[in-house]
Amino acid sequence: RQRQMCIRDRRMMDACADFGRAVVVLDRPNPNGSYIDGPVLDMKYKSGVGALPIPVVHGLTMGEIARMAVGEGWAKPCDLTVVKCRNYTHATEYLLPVAPSPNLPTARAVYLYAALCPFEGTVVSLGRGTDKPFEMYGHPDMTGRTFSFTPRPTAGAKHPPLEGRLCRGVDLSGMPLAEAREVGFSLRYVIDACADLEMGDKFFTPMFEKLVGVGWVREMILAGASEAEIR
């Protein structure tokens, strides 16, 4: 849900409806399209990183989201055509032939995105400014960690969080792809970092609620709840 493509598509559909233009979506597979996970967006947290009331991992293709947006009234009625993908089902294991973003350079990063994206709403780095963004996390004050990295300016992150500071944390880049594909919207990593840093509410920023889509996840993490209890 946090990726901005579906938000831009909905805005384009609204603009086409206003000007009487047809919309044609050439559909593509979703590499995380085999499951649904995470909270449905509470629309009071609607923002540029979440504008539709769908789960964090929605499992839909762009064409399916476009149809749903029109059908549910989330987008203005428009002349919509979706050109379907041949031989694709939601059980298809699909590896993207081209990286969708400089910050999602590998299949592992794509699979771990849902679990690591909430760090964008915390003081922790998720590896922007390294060669393995979304495959690690860390902070200068994390303790008892042997892995370290230092964020530097890159093509995909000119001024990454914690730029130039040595961060200690966790390296997930060696996780087998099959295991990474099963992680889903896991809060285990955020809970781990929050407990380690012992910063209380200062661990989070207002962006956290916009990313997870609800207000009670932060509260439960700070109360010491486990991932299973939060789910």
Spell out what each predicted region is.
Residues 24-25, 82, 135:
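Structural recognition of the beta-strand scaffold that forms the well-ordered cores
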Residues 45-116:
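Conserved anion/nucleotide-ligand pocket segment
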Residues 1, 26-29, 85-86, 139, ...:
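Active-site-proximal beta-strand/loop segments in catalytic clefts of secreted hydrolases
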